[in-house]
Amino acid sequence: MGNREMEELIPLVNRLQDAFSALGQSCLLELPQIAVVGGQSAGKSSVLENFVGRDFLPRGSGIVTRRPLVLQLVTSKAEYAEFLHCKGKKFTDFDEVRHEIEAETDRVTGMNKGISSIPINLRVYSPHVLNLTLIDLPGITKVPVGDQPPDIEYQIRDMIMQFITRENCLILAVTPANTDLANSDALKLAKEVDPQGLRTIGVITKLDLMDEGTDARDVLENKLLPLRRGYVGVVNRSQKDIDGKKDIKAAMLAERKFFLSHPAYRHIADRMGTPHLQKVLNQQLTNHIRDTLPNFRNKLQGQLLSIEHEVEAFKNFKPEDPTRKTKALLQMVQQFAVDFEKRIEGSGDQVDTLELSGGAKINRIFHERFPFEIVKMEFNEKELRREISYAIKNIHGIRTGLFTPDMAFEAIVKKQIVKLKGPSLKSVDLVMQELINTVKKCTKRLANFPRLCEETERIVANHIREREGKTKDQVLLLIDIQVSYINTNHEDFIGFANAQQRSSQVHKKSTIGNQVIRKGWLTVSNIGIMKGGSKGYWFVLTAESLSWYKDDEEKEKKYMLPLDNLKVRDVEKGFMSSKHVFALFNTEQRNVYKDYRFLELACDSQEDVDSWKASLLRAGVYPDKSVGSNKTENDENGQAENFSMDPQLERQVETIRNLVDSYMSIINKCIRDLIPKTIMHLMINNVKDFINSELLAQLYSSEDQNTLMEESAEQAQRRDEMLRMYQALKEALAIIGDINTATVSTPAPPPVDDSWLQHSRRSPPPSPTTQRRLTISAPLPRPTSGRGPAPAIPSPGPHSGAPPVPFRPGPLPPFPNSSDSFGAPPQVPSRPTRAPPSVPSRRPPPSPTRPTIIRPLESSLLD
């Protein structure tokens, strides 16, 4: 791929970096970059300055770079620099750039030589650079100097690893040529995070400072300690050159001259030097960006989809539009009306699967809670019979009656009908509360405008309470109507004749066949206590029995309990218990289950308890209304009189009891039918009509429109941030989409072939030229190395390591014949047992025979 295409591609990433850095998202997005890693005084700063063509990085002894420097190089006709923290300010004097880097470093890290992982973003525009993005990291050091913290080595290592462990970060490992390459900290760190060598580019500096008679040809030809992407050699300015004001241009010319004139490098001069390093880095970065963009695009699209639904309500919002408030108010009231109706009437669109809607809860009130409250109020048999007995006796007075008085029937019936007011009014209260809860949920969409939300909720809630009063009046009127006239000619009323015939019979509940009424999970709490813990079972309620199974597959039945003579009662919630409990018991004092008189069943909520009670009621299991233990004297007298009733009075009581039961069943059916209809008409439908027709007018009349449509500061900020993020994501995806599809990437180089190491051990003595370069070499690998075969063990084949690939021919010694290459023992078999040659310390004048590039066959870098 040509330089033109590279120049088009890499600025896209710079634009992405700027777009998200401004939003504080740079730390979340791993964009392709090149991290420069090396020891202190390895020449990292000089390499970067050669790219820019200017002196702009701080220099000094010890640790100078204490924060990562994100350096973006941009080709431009003008030459200047910009910092992200000083956006808009152009630095044309690069001495000021150096001072700003030092000042910004001190602002975060202080003056105690500490470090920080917060990057400094610097963009340099120049006609002398190619488009590159690099990160200059602090130099690797091991011993703290001066007032550096004791753990400075680990701090620097952690910070470097924070950058180079990213899969989309290329590593520029800088190593001086006059040090031991096998012990390069930069290469070791790169090898640790990039064992395949796909992300590592080696840079050899200070080639001009090597001792006389030595060179780095084998390293630069990628023969010694090879890297998959190879090495590039550079020659930087010395401190003497810098002090002598030698400019970058002159240094580049001197570098070019050095490679062309050096006998060991002239044949590879076109692949050496800072200009070639720039091109290599550009090519590698471009390839890496192209490989990363598909995953990056998917990540951006995922973020875009996650906020798109919220942004949909924001993106058409235009504060500068004078009519926006009227339009927004109208749309929000309409949406509120639609949401309210959907929650009440139900809708197949966007069904909530987590909780019941307002309409579903009102349905449960109508058909489960209200009937249950009626039955719970109605069935108190002993008290009812006592009241009938008193009514008969009081009507007869001093006389002895021969016939059953119908006035006693009317008195008892009217009293029972009046008792229906309690459950009826309670159902109105429950429905009102559900309507208000529904309104609160619907106004959440208006949360962008707190005043509008508050006013809407207030107006609708006030109307609901107003309708509640009128609905209660109508409910009381309906019950009073029933009390006003007792219609004994009703077609379903049994009449006196039938009541007398049934007076001697025991009243039995009517069954509805053996159909399944309800299924669900319940916890048997009292049995579980005896056996070490409560257990959950799958219960099936029919019209005749209550069965429970091990699970909802209903294969293993645990027990079947007949419903005859069963009643249900409430059980107080236990201490520290989150369960709601009710109990079943037998009215004839028999055991319900094995040795247990009560069967206590637990639910997760009171709603579930009420629902199960209503289902049991449908099956004929009525609630028990226990009579208090503290009885008054009148109760005791009345109870005594009940025991002393004569047979005639007993027959009259039973007759009226049957008449009351028959007539109240008619009234109950009527009330259970009319009360929900009354609530629906006077309350629910009226509230819906009010919201559709009058809410908007009342909002306009209640407050000024501008006041209603004022956004909260938090919402305005959130909306702006959401829209800005949305636009940034759209722009980022558009930038990625702009990449020329015709561009192609250079494929990654194959794994390096280290089979030449095997051959070199078996080769005849090298030529004098080669001998000069290999005067002193490092020892061969120890025979006990755990990461490679021992030297004494012959290799199974010439290609036992990485797959063999063609490599650049160099002045390698001639290979022995093939019969020798497998059978001959390694050259110098006693070499592994010898201590490595000592490296004398640098002191003037340097020893002409001192090795500069030590070439150990380090298994940690070769495997």
Swiss-Prot record:
Its main location: cytoplasm. This is Dynamin-3. Its EC number is 3.6.5.5. Disulfide bonds: none annotated. Keywords: Acetylation, Cytoplasm, Cytoskeleton, Endocytosis, GTP-binding, Hydrolase, Microtubule, Motor protein, Nucleotide-binding, Phosphoprotein. The modification N6-acetyllysine is found at K299, K594. Residues 136-139 are annotated as: G3 motif. Residues 626-647, 742-863 are annotated as: Disordered. Residues 653-744 form the GED domain. GO terms for biological process: synaptic vesicle endocytosis. The modification Phosphotyrosine is found at Y231, Y593. The keyword GTP-binding applies. Residues 38-45 are annotated as: G1 motif. Microtubule-associated force-producing protein involved in producing microtubule bundles and able to bind and hydrolyze GTP. Most probably involved in vesicular trafficking processes, in particular endocytosis. GTP binds at residues 38-46, 205-211, 236-239. Residues 235-238 are annotated as: G5 motif. Residues 791-816, 826-849 have a biased composition (Pro residues). It is found in: Cytoplasm; Cytoplasm, Cytoskeleton. Residues 627-642 have a biased composition (Polar residues). Residues 205-208 are annotated as: G4 motif. Residues 515-621 form the PH domain. The modification Phosphoserine is found at S763, S767, S847. Belongs to the TRAFAC class dynamin-like GTPase superfamily. Dynamin/Fzo/YdjA family. It is an enzyme of class 3 (hydrolase). It catalyses: GTP + H2O = GDP + phosphate + H(+).
